[in-house]
């Protein structure tokens, strides 16, 4: 998102967005085989249909089980790279790119909201296959900012539950 480099410019930008009257739903979606990212399957068709059944989000935050870190991190770059964190699959799967924008300002705001988890802004990771194999079916135009939140490998289930309760 170019041109949005201060909180006031971000607020000006968001003032022009359609208001969200309700909280967005929280979805738990497993990707199954990474091949679901490129094949027409019952899973991929359901992900496409699911996106039609819920309001279009202004951004998507994904907690990925494929990103275990020391501490909690959130992607905070303008354009997160597509990560192919698997092996033994056809070249066609490795060729997939999902060029969704990120949103560093929203990442910072999210980190601030989760202050008790000491969330660190990350500028290196990107979107792993736990994210893009699903999101590319839901939002194929890659025009909605996508942020990815890691799982702290030292966190207890209770700590992770508390992170999920924050709004």
What are these regions (language model features)?
Residues 107-160:
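Internal, conserved structured core segments that host functional sites
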Residues 30-32, 130, 164:
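Glycine-centered flexibility sites
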Residues 3-117:
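A short aromatic-anchored loop/beta-hairpin motif
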Residues 11, 45-46, 136, 153, ...:
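Arginine residue identity/basic-tract feature
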